[in-house]
Amino acid sequence: MSSQEASKMLRTYNIAWWGNNYYDVNELGHISVCPDPDVPEARVDLAQLVKTREAQGQRLPALFCFPQILQHRLRSINAAFKRARESYGYNGDYFLVYPIKVNQHRRVIESLIHSGEPLGLEAGSKAELMAVLAHAGMTRSVIVCNGYKDREYIRLALIGEKMGHKVYLVIEKMSEIAIVLDEAERLNVVPRLGVRARLASQGSGKWQSSGGEKSKFGLAATQVLQLVETLREAGRLDSLQLLHFHLGSQMANIRDIATGVRESARFYVELHKLGVNIQCFDVGGGLGVDYEGTRSQSDCSVNYGLNEYANNIIWAIGDACEENGLPHPTVITESGRAVTAHHTVLVSNIIGVERNEYTVPTAPVEDAPRALQSMWETWQEMHEPGTRRSLREWLHDSQMDLHDIHIGYSSGTFSLQERAWAEQLYLSMCHEVQKQLDPQNRAHRPIIDELQERMADKMYVNFSLFQSMPDAWGIDQLFPVLPLEGLDQVPERRAVLLDITCDSDGAIDHYIDGDGIATTMPMPEYDPENPPMLGFFMVGAYQEILGNMHNLFGDTEAVDVFVFPDGSVEVELSDEGDTVADMLQYVQLDPKTLLTQFRDQVKKTDLDAELQQQFLEEFEAGLYGYTYLEDE
């Protein structure tokens, strides 16, 4: 592949931007993965890796996870804040606290803990807190407790504090403080408290409701004052050590971040004036990732990088401290998405392709209905030299004629053969118009989009959108999707991807297409009998956890991939994936009972004993097989 072709391919899929140096296209036109861009010689051909794994029995779909990417992301964020602190002369520390709700899998938590980097952990529920406390002995850093809290949750956090961990119980509802003080006295432990302030500042986009004045969590200004007085009266004002706020997830615009940090810095200043010795400034989440690769303010992109993000936070807090003669607090960020998104790729196979194949029909008979003759006349005019009608007009005329024919077919005016003839001619017209369109002509752009969607291949992919990419369905989030090979060719085809659930919502609606977003995916030419494998990238944040059981499709297999500078690769199976029996048990259908019921039915048939046994064995094998489609 020439450098010019490679550059064009990278621009088509924006790999250079969302790939963030972890993903690239190699000289074979395959996706390659470099888990640590600081060690560029440690890379693997993902297409070849998947084929090797398949030959060894790997089932698709499967998650290919790269723990080394997690560790590099953590190092990169820590390094950005180190540079920002040095640049400003900031005296406080910095900790990244990983909110495990983003991805609670053991491989994620332990990969981050074993990275050698400073790291804290955040919990938002009792179950998460138990996981965090169990791992806390490996990290000896900071634990932040968010979310709704009952007495058991609060006791667990205080037990962690009594064990020697630095556990911050963040007060998000006024009702929590009485329980905290009561249980702290019972356990004879000094609580370490935080307060979540509800800001007026708010981000924009799909996740904006998680921040701002209408946020589900946090205390309003009046409630913050009430909390301070309650603690003062209880003689526990010194326990309030952390200020927390959250602007929203996936903040696209750096200006929104800067505005929110400045507002929260005022809370820090005012709390100090009230005698509260705040030591930690937790800015929460919000550090976004560029799913689109457009470097813009759109919902699934960001217009800033790690350095700019860190600089805006450190300088805003530092300036507020300097102006008011206050100490520089320890800065905490809860950057879960930015740590985990890149490290996981869902790989699956295409199980079927439906192309809009067509043949130009012969001319209609002389006494054919007027609509058929009109379509044919338009077709002939399209091939006459010097015609003055526009491409758009030809397309509109043919669409109106086809619409009349469809209505006429429903009323019995047109036969099935006539409808098929009209549809074939219409496809021929679309193809002819498509050839004459110029992507550089702005007037042609809407027609190009319309025809690309109309003529796109339908690719049926062996996965469940609801299980593996629920945010693509629930909030129209865009994820990078592209073939793992064939990227040394110009993407001359278009496709739409459909999953294997029995739900029309099981389709991907938005795809990266250069600097824009399209409703069809650019595809290089391929053999429909042997289509390429597809990679769904940046699914490491939230998707595994939010996935649901629609049609009883379960968790996919998952492998952890480690790549070394000498070119060697180690692959470990981290999740065998759900079986049919696993999924049935989730809905209280006992596999053994089902097998017994099926056996009873088979025995009542007139089938011979050998066939009965064969059917029973097939049923039982299916119960303990993969929930996704499997080749023979």
Curated annotation (Swiss-Prot):
Keywords: Decarboxylase, Lyase, Magnesium, Metal-binding, Polyamine biosynthesis, Putrescine biosynthesis, Pyridoxal phosphate, Spermidine biosynthesis. Its EC number is 4.1.1.19. It is an enzyme of class 4 (lyase). Pfam families: Arg_decarb_HB, Arg_decarbox_C, Orn_Arg_deC_N. The modification N6-(pyridoxal phosphate)lysine is found at K101. One of its GO terms (molecular function) is metal ion binding. InterPro entries: Ala_racemase/Decarboxylase_C, Arg_decarb_HB, Arg_decarbox_C, Arg_decrbxlase, De-COase2_CS, De-COase2_N, De-COase2_pyr-phos_BS, Orn/DAP/Arg_de-COase. It comes from the Bacteria. It catalyses: L-arginine + H(+) = agmatine + CO2. Pathway: Amine and polyamine biosynthesis; agmatine biosynthesis; agmatine from L-arginine: step 1/1. Its cofactor is Mg(2+); pyridoxal 5'-phosphate. GO terms for biological process: arginine catabolic process; putrescine biosynthetic process from arginine; spermidine biosynthetic process. Substrate binds at F281, D282, V283, G284, G285, G286, L287, G288, V289, D290, Y291. Catalyzes the biosynthesis of agmatine from arginine. PANTHER family: ARGININE DECARBOXYLASE, BIOSYNTHETIC ARGININE DECARBOXYLASE. Belongs to the Orn/Lys/Arg decarboxylase class-II family. SpeA subfamily. This is Biosynthetic arginine decarboxylase. It comes from Shigella flexneri serotype 5b (strain 8401).
